């Protein structure tokens, strides 16, 4: 049943742009349709009644809750650290996205974590930002994403956008 729900969730997301569904539906309905089944924190917003409440897939949900509470985020259209988020969705520091990736990979809820990871890291075309020496190129690229950046260590670090790892 979880595999079927996960597949339906991915199908729904494949017709969306960022976290927003293109169909005309109400805000409450949107939030309910975009939260991964069996979780309260995995998706657009959350459905929890408080920070300690988790859904049926507690390990996956805990990863999503921690990710949602990242202290360094940039909302759509916001400028911060000398960067502007031109995406239609919130972007996070690479540190938070890396921790989210590792948490999902190590989760005891293997199937739900797999689908949430695939959705966030593979389907949603997003980037993260971090303080790093200026990027001079990409040493290795796959599926349109840079896997290994080359940097100029002779110059001071600046905030820049980076591709997320594939899940």
From Swiss-Prot:
This protein's UniProt keywords: Allergen, Calcium, Disulfide bond, Glycoprotein, Hydrolase, Lipid degradation, Lipid metabolism, Metal-binding, Secreted, Signal
Subcellular localization: Secreted
Alphabetically, the GO molecular function entries are: calcium ion binding; phospholipase A2 activity
Q: What reactions does this protein catalyze? A: a 1,2-diacyl-sn-glycero-3-phosphocholine + H2O = a 1-acyl-sn-glycero-3-phosphocholine + a fatty acid + H(+)
Q: Which cysteines are joined by disulfide bonds?
A: 42-64, 63-103, 70-96, 94-128, 138-146
In the record, the note on similarity to other proteins reads:
Belongs to the phospholipase A2 family. Group III subfamily.
What name has this protein been given in UniProt?
Phospholipase A2
Q: Which organism is it from?
A: Apis mellifera (Honeybee)
